[in-house]
C-alpha cells in the first residue's frame, strides 16, 4: 500500500501546457482516418467501418472483443484481429483514442480569424484588418500574394481587392490599368494572342456590371506581370508561411519607439493599441516556436466516440451528440470537394464548395459565434466544441469544478434540541442508504480486527442486501458500530462561506427529517421553515480524519469574517438564560445563605426559594475561582445555576457589564452585615444575547477549545428549559399605549403646507421640496421612536413580556416597537438606478408616510403602500442574492491563488492606519484599535505625549496591546499588510497576522484568498440595494451606497456624473471659493501657479479657504473615479481609498469585516504593472507583469549592470483581474474561455498549477491546508480530535 501511495504521489500533475497543434501532431494522435459519415448500422447497431464510431480506429465496443467476434477473451489482450483490424483491449480506450479527417483544402481556424472577444490572431500577424481576413477566408474577395515585378506596382502586397463589381469599382480600374500595361508592352504586335487577349479582357472590364472569368484574367496577369491573386484559407496559409517573425518584431518595435515617449497619453490611440497587440502576438509566436501557419488547418482531429455518444431511446429511436452532426457534414462536404477537384470543375463551383467546407468546420469549432448557426430540427443551435467548454453548463464549470457527488442525500431539517454540538440526527432510511457498503462489509466479515475467524452474520452480499432492505433486527448493532467510525458533512445551499459545510457525528433518528443542532443554524443561515440540507459521507481515512480534526461543528465557534462568536444562542435560548439570570427584590427565600451549590438546588427544587431571589453563597464551595478574600457572594439562585456550568477557574459571573472579575461590593466579608450589604447592592441587568456572546469570547480566549462547546450545550439546555418555565406569552394587551404622535403629525402637516406654498411661489425647486418633505417625516418618526424607547424603559414595563423579549435580544428591536404602536413611517418604492437623469435627487421613497401603527390599523391607501414596500423588499432580496453570489464568485476567482506559504517575507513596507471617519458627518466608521489588532507592527509605536514605548517593532498586536494603544490616544500606526507582502507566491504569515477564527498566527497552507473572498461576499446579501440620503440639508446630493457602491468600487467603474467627487491634482493651499454665473470656483495656489476647479452649484464642498490639499484630496463630496485617482495621486492613495470605501459600505450597515481581508483583495486588483520602457529586459512595451516578478527582474538587471525596465501601476476591476492570473485554466474557467485559451495556445503557455482552481480541474490535491501534509499526519490529527470530543 505504501508503495502504491508513493507511486500515486509521483503521479501528481506538475503543470499543463497548451499550444497550437500542427497537422503532423494531429495525425500522430490519431489511430486512423475517418472517411465515411456513417455512425452505426441501423440493423445490427454495430459501428460502421471507416465511420465515426469505427472499432478499428477507436477501439472495441465490448471489453476484449473484436468486431467480427474472432477473439473474445482477456488472454488475447494486445493482439489485432487479422479479419476486422480491431485491437483487443478494454472498451475504455473509446474515451481517449482519436481519429482524424484529412481535408481536401486548408481551412482557417475560427478562433484565429474571428475578432471577438480577442483581436483576430491572423489579422495581427499579417497586419491585415480582420474584416479583410474574413472576406478572403470566406471567398468574398481576393488578396494580393505577389504585387508583381513592376517598378511602381499597381497593387500593394497583401491588399484585399473586390473584383465582384458589386462594391467599389477601384479594383476593376486597377486591373484595367495592369491590362493596359500589358497591351502597351505588346503594342508593336497587335495580331499577337497576348495583345488580343489583353484587349478582350480590358473591354470586358470596361462595363462594371459584366461578369468575367476572374481565374482566367488572374492567370493571364500572373504570367505576364508576376502579380498573383489568392482567395480562401490557401491564400492566407501562403502568406503566413512567408512571414518572418523576427523582421516583423523589429519593425513594430521601431514604429513604437517613434511614439513611445508619449505612450501614456497615446494608450488610447488606435494605432498604438494595434501596434502593441501585434507586438504581443508576434513575440508570443516567436518565443513559443509555433509556426504561424498552424493557425490554418489541414487536418481535423475527430474526438473519441464515447465523448459524443449515440444513445438508444425507448422504441427504435436514437439520440446523438451534436458533435456527430458536425463531423457528418464535414466528411460529406470534404469527400464531395475531393471529387470536384478530381473532375476539374470550374472555379465558381470549386470556391463555393471550399467555402461550404470552411463554414462547416467553423461550425464544429464555434457554432454560436457564426451569423447563422447550424440548427437542429427544432431550430435550436447545435452545441459546438466551444459551447461545450464555456459558460455555467460548460465542461469547466459543470464537469470539472462542480461535480455531482456519490454517497450523498438530502432532506428537510428540523430542530434537534437534545443533540450535542457535534451531533446530527440522520433518519434511519438515509443512514441505511448512505452507509450501505460499510454495513454490508461488516455483515459478511469472516475475520475480526485481531485476525480471528468469526461466523459472518450474512453468508454473502445478496443476503446482506436483503437484510438491509427488510430492516432486520440483527443489522442495528452493526449500523451503530459503522456510524461511529465516520462523521458526515452537512451542507446548506447557498454555501456563502466556509461554515456552510460542517462535519457532525451521525445519530439515528426516527422520521424522515434531519435533526440539526440549534446553535449551528446561524453559521448555516438555516431556519426550520422547510429548509433542506445535503449530507455527504467522507470515504477515505484522510477525508474522515480531516472532517474530524478540522470541520467538526464544535470547533467552529468564531466566524472567519470578524473573529466574533458565530455559535451564539438565539431566540428561545436567549430568553431562557435572560429569565434565569433576572434579579428581583422581595422574592421568596431572599437573604438565605447557602454553604454550597447543592443546597441551593435542593432549596429551589423544594420551592423554598425563588429562582430570582437574592441569596448568599459561601466562596468556600467555589475553591478554584479567583477570589482575593473568602466571604459570602451575593447572587441569585439563577446565577448560581448559570455559574455551575462554567469552568471552575472562571471568574464568578454576576454582573453582565463586568465579566472578567467580581466586584467586591458583591462579597460580604467576615464582620460585615449581610442584610445591610444585600439591601445596598444594586440589581444587575440579566444576561442578554450580547452578554452571552461576550461570555463565549472569554471562554474561547482563556480555556481549552473542547471546553467551549460543552458550556454552549449547557447554555442551550438551560435556554430551552427556563424559557419554557418562564411561560412567556404575548398578547395585544401587553402593548403599551402611546398618544403623543398626533402633535408631531399636525406640526409636520403645517410645515408641508408651507413648503408647498414656497414651491408654488418658485422659492424652492421640486427636488428641494421633495428632499425637505422626506427629511421632515424621517424626523417625525425619529421623535416617535425616541418617545417609545423612553416608554419601554419605564419601570412598570420591566416585566412586560414583549419588552423582555426585545430587551434580552431574543427577537425584535426598537424599530419593530415603533411600527407596532408608534407609526409605520415612510415606505420605499421601486426606482431605476441606471437611468441617466440630470436630477440630483433619486426619488425612491413615497413622500406620504404611513401615519398609523399596526395596533391602530392602516387605512386602505396605507395598506396598499405598505404591502408595496414589503413586496419590493422581497424582490430586492431575490435580486440581491444572485448579484451577491456573482460578486463572491468574482472575488474568489481574483484571490484563489493567495495561500499562506512563507513565515516572513522581511518587507519593510506596510500601511499607515488611522481611524476611518465618515467625511459627511465625522462619525467614526472604524477605530484604530479595531484596525491594528491581530496584526504585526513595522515600526515601534510610542505614546504621542509621554513618548513611552507601547509596542516594539515586529510585534503582534494583541487585543490587550490594542486597548493600551487606544487609551494612549495614538492617532496612527505603521503595520504589516498583505498589500505589500513580497512573497512571490501567496503571502507570508507576518503580513497577514493572526487567523481570526483561532486567535493564533495564521498557519502555513491556509487558503487565505478564498477565506477573504467569502468574508467579503457572504455579508453582501445583507447590504441594501437602495441609495441612502446622507446628511441633513437639501443640497446634499445622493451617494450610491450599499451593494451598488460596493460593485462600483470592486469593478473599478467610474461613478455617475452627479456623484463624482472633484479631486485636487497637485499639492497646494485653498486660496478662495467663489462663484460665477455657471459654477462655483475653488482656487488652489500650488508651488508653481494657481489652479481653478469649477464645480456645480449643488456639489457639497469639503474644503475651506487656507486648507492644505494634496494630490487626490477631495474638494467636493462624492465618489472618486479610481482610474483618475491613480493618475493623479499614485497607487498608494488608491489602495488606501479602496480600503476605506469598502469598510464604509459595510460598517454603515453594521457589518464588521476585518481590514486584512479587504487588503488581500486590493492586493490582487493592484499587483500588476504595465511596462512603458523595456530597457535591456525581455519585456515588450505595453506588457502586463506581476509586481513582485518585476521587482525581482529589476534587481537582477541592476546587479548585472544592465538598464532596467520601467513600468507604471495598473488597477483592474474584478471582471478583469481573474484573467490576468498566471493560470490559463483558472482564467478560462471564469469568463471569456475562448479568448483566454486562444491567447494561451499562441503563447505555448504552461500552467504551473499554483492556485486552487487549476488543481481541482486536474484532479490534484489543492496546494493548501492538508494538501501540504502527508496522509499519516492527517490521520493522526483525526485520531487526536476524536479523543477531544466530549
From Swiss-Prot:
The entry lists its GO molecular-function terms as:
DNA binding; DNA-directed RNA polymerase activity; magnesium ion binding; zinc ion binding
EC nos: 2.7.7.6
Q: Name one Pfam family in it.
A: RNA_pol_Rpb1_3
Does this entry carry the keyword Methyltransferase?
A: no
Detail which positions bind Zn(2+) 1: 66, 68, 81, 84
Named cofactor requirement(s): Mg(2+); Zn(2+)
Q: Which family does it belong to?
A: Belongs to the RNA polymerase beta' chain family.
Query: Per its UniProt record, what PANTHER family does this chain match?
Result: DNA-DIRECTED RNA POLYMERASE (PTHR19376), DNA-DIRECTED RNA POLYMERASE SUBUNIT BETA (PTHR19376:SF54)
Can you name this protein? DNA-directed RNA polymerase subunit beta'
In the record, what lineage is assigned to the organism producing the protein? Bacteria, Bacillati, Mycoplasmatota, Mycoplasmoidales, Mycoplasmoidaceae
